[in-house]
C-alpha cells in the first residue's frame, strides 16, 4: 500500500501528514506539481521481468503518457536480490547514486513501479514528503524539485522510466545532508509492512 508521510524540513520528530489513501496522496502532491496515479497491475508480469515483457504489458499506458507529456525516451530499470556475488556491490552503488538530495534541471523524474517499492523524498516549501511507492504507482516529480530516492539496502524493484531528453537521468546535487536526517527506506518499509500485516 502506498504511503505518504510529511515532516517539517527541520526533522522527523513531528509528523505533519501520514496517509495511505490514494485520493489524499494525489490531493496533497498536486499543489507541488507532482503527478501521482495508480495504473492497473498486470499479475502475469514477473517481478524481475525484462524490458520487452514490461513494454508489452504496459504498452497502452506508456503510449498514453508519452502522448500526454511528450516523453521521447522510455526504459526499464530493475534491481533484485540475487546470489550473484556482485549484487551487494551493485545494490550499494545504485542506492548511493540516488540517495543524496538533487534536482533535475532539464527533465521531470517520472517512474512507474512494475514491481517492488522505493521511496521518493520531496523537499519542497519547508517540508519533506516521503512517498512510499509500490507496484502500480506512477509518480512524476517536476524538473527543479529538490528530492532524493531510496531503494533500501536490498533493492527489489522494477520501474519504467520516462524522459523528455535522450540523455536520461542527470542529477544536479545540492550538497545538502538532509537525507541523512530522515528515516530511510528500510526503516519506513519495516514499519509500513509491519503495520499492514
From Swiss-Prot:
Pathway: Amino-acid biosynthesis; L-methionine biosynthesis via salvage pathway; L-methionine from S-methyl-5-thio-alpha-D-ribose 1-phosphate: step 5/6. The record marks 107 as: May play a role in transmitting local conformational changes. It is an enzyme of class 1 (oxidoreductase). Its EC number is 1.13.11.54, 1.13.11.53. Keywords: Amino-acid biosynthesis, Dioxygenase, Iron, Metal-binding, Methionine biosynthesis, Nickel, Oxidoreductase. It catalyses: 1,2-dihydroxy-5-(methylsulfanyl)pent-1-en-3-one + O2 = 3-(methylsulfanyl)propanoate + CO + formate + 2 H(+); 1,2-dihydroxy-5-(methylsulfanyl)pent-1-en-3-one + O2 = 4-methylsulfanyl-2-oxobutanoate + formate + 2 H(+). Its cofactor is Fe(2+); Ni(2+). Ni(2+) binds at residues 102, 104, 109, 147. GO terms for biological process: L-methionine salvage from methylthioadenosine; L-methionine salvage from S-adenosylmethionine. InterPro entries: ARD, ARD_bac, RmlC-like_jellyroll, RmlC_Cupin_sf. Fe(2+) binds at residues 102, 104, 109, 147. HAMAP family: Salvage_MtnD. Belongs to the acireductone dioxygenase (ARD) family. Catalyzes 2 different reactions between oxygen and the acireductone 1,2-dihydroxy-3-keto-5-methylthiopentene (DHK-MTPene) depending upon the metal bound in the active site. Fe-containing acireductone dioxygenase (Fe-ARD) produces formate and 2-keto-4-methylthiobutyrate (KMTB), the alpha-ketoacid precursor of methionine in the methionine recycle pathway. Ni-containing acireductone dioxygenase (Ni-ARD) produces methylthiopropionate, carbon monoxide and formate, and does not lie on the methionine recycle pathway. This is Acireductone dioxygenase. It comes from Streptomyces avermitilis (strain ATCC 31267 / DSM 46492 / JCM 5070 / NBRC 14893 / NCIMB 12804 / NRRL 8165 / MA-4680).
